[in-house]
Amino acid sequence: NYLWLCLIALPLGLGAGSVDAALNDFVARNFAARHMNWLHSFWGVGATSGPLIMAFMLSQTGRWQMGYRTVAIVQFTLVAILAFSLPLWQRFPTPTSPHTTTGRVKIRKLKGIAPNLVAFFAYCAVELSTGLWAASFLVQQRGLSQVLAAGGASAYYLGITVGRFLNGFLSSHFKAKNLVRGGVAMILVGIILMFLPFPILSLAGLMIIGLGCAPIYPTLLHETPRRFGAENSATLMGLQMATAYVGLTLMPPLLGVVVGRFGLQFFPLGLLLLALLLVFGTERLNKVLAEQQA
């Protein structure tokens, strides 16, 4: 029943957060940037597949429980894959992480940590706020049908997925900070298009925002051991994940309260403010790192 669904969401979230942090840390330390981008492009495949599985099960059985049972089977399959692949993980060196109190104090004193966390918070706030509220904006403010609006939201996530796949190739030719800057610039362009009162431009803006989002998150994650040291990577990865999830959890409903009070016409403005916070975080981080290297 629904109560049990809410209760099991807690251990599911704890497990997902642990796997997320550990897997990102492992890939960041041992693989190239292209692998991190391709890893996160498959997040897009999963994010797209989940609603499709639920919709299919609802149409076939009329019961939402079957959708969750199907996803549970996928989760147990994932657990089995992770368990059987553990010997492969042990082939790679594991740096000593600073788990002591002194180590944690050292982490907090690393230069660039604060703007780095701001960037993670703001990025995830932009990503999920766009995905959750874009369809409503297109219907109520641009007069699109629900079908077209849903297609626009799907195009947004498709942009993230395809963009990350392509970014896997681009990461070999461009510096990490330039990939992030390019992504942030595309997000700003997409948001500006959403201010304009033309449905086709709003749809295009949504797709551009998705493409802009593509390189930012995996690139920031992959640079963690290089910017802050491999010995700090595991602890920092967890801290970054936690900060990102705070952005995911708090900002979309907060933006919903604002647009509910003042109207969905303020949705692009809310996205713009979050995007400017992302600009501040990424550029401040670049400045701190440049000063360290000087």
Predicted regions and their residues:
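Symmetry-related core transmembrane helices of the 12-TM Major Facilitator Superfamily/SLC fold
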Residues: 66-87, 266-284
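Interfacial helix-cap and linker-helix signal at transmembrane-aqueous boundaries
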Residues: 53-62, 138-139, 170-171, 254-263
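Loop-to-transmembrane helix entry/capping segments in MFS-fold secondary transporters
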Residues: 32-42, 146-147, 230-240
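Cytoplasmic helix-loop-helix junction between adjacent transmembrane helices
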Residues: 8-42
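Extracytoplasmic gate region of multi-pass secondary transporters
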Residues: 111-162
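Juxtamembrane intracellular "pre-TM" segments in multi-pass secondary transporters
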Residues: 89-117
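C-terminal transmembrane helical hairpin of 12-TM major facilitator-type secondary transporters
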Residues: 174-220
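A late C-terminal transmembrane helix in Major Facilitator Superfamily
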Residues: 230-264
